[in-house]
Amino acid sequence: MFSYNRLLFLIDHLIWGILVLVFVFFIFQSEYFLTERNISNILTAAAVLGVLVAGQTFVLISGNFDLSTESTLGLAALVGIWLIVPAGPTTFGGGIYMNPYLSIICSLSMGALIGYIIGCLITYGNMHNFIVTLAALLVIRGLMMAFTEGAPVSGFNNPSADVFYWLGHEKAFKVPGLGKISVAVLATGLVYIVCHLILKHHKFGRELYAIGGNRDAAEALGINVNRRIRQVYMLSGLLAALGGWMLAGRVVSIQSNLGETFIFTVFAGAVIGGVSLQGGRGTMLGALGG
């Protein structure tokens, strides 16, 4: 007998069957599709979006959504590079000469801080998540434009910026049939493993499903809903900052429009992967496929 739970599992992960069909289609369409170099490039290009989709999945499962992801990505990367690159006429930097690894911590913290502020406005200010995150998207993008004066950020050739280049370009090892696997792909895989464990085997994940499924019932069960919402936006901001680190290192440039229009692809990836816009449903495995 086909149980209801098994049917839901198949529906949530239907994307993987579709991916197999698309994969087979392109194999017959082009002799170059299955080359190691092409597969490696596809995986590397998808790594940034994969991290953003993971963060958005947490938010969607809780019954909320985050439109500020793409702007958070850009500002966090901008802050990280500004802290380590010397100030000068040909470089963009604050002249702080911060330790590169410490600058990465600051960059990730910036993402988490933005998420926390958004969460506080939603919970303490009793404001709708659409209004707050849309405003954050526009305000942060404006700050980036003012900070950079609309010019591309240079300075990636500085040795201190190698930590950005490492995550965006460095190849970890070679896998037969898949080519050289980049550090970004490995980082994305690790993110999904950790996020899957949190959703399925941790109290935090179970409470998110409860909040997204029925907020009133979750509150009646004693779940601190507002605190979880703040935490979920912090997590989304943190993962957006990680995505910014990856993207900046891959394109070796930061512009005021870094990550622009990503939000549409991120939402599409999560929803196609079986994550409900109504909340309370979705898996990391499905989101990864999306």
Regions found by a protein language model. Give the residues of each.
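Membrane-interfacial amphipathic/re-entrant helices at transmembrane-helix boundaries
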Residues: 1-53, 88-102, 174-177, 223, ...
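Transmembrane helix-bundle core of multi-pass membrane transporters
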Residues: 4, 101, 130-201, 228-231, ...
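Hydrophobic alpha-helical transmembrane segments
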Residues: 12-17, 42, 71-75, 101-109, ...
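Hydrophobic core segments of alpha-helical transmembrane domains in multi-pass membrane transport
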Residues: 15-28, 56, 81, 111, ...
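Single transmembrane alpha-helix segments in multi-pass membrane proteins
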Residues: 24-92, 113, 120-127, 267, ...
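Alpha-helical transmembrane segments within multi-pass membrane transporters and channels
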Residues: 89-137, 289-290
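Helix-loop-helix "hairpin" substructures at the membrane interface of multi-pass membrane proteins
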Residues: 99-107, 114-118, 122, 176-254, ...
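Transmembrane alpha-helical segments in multi-pass inner-membrane proteins
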Residues: 234, 240, 250-290
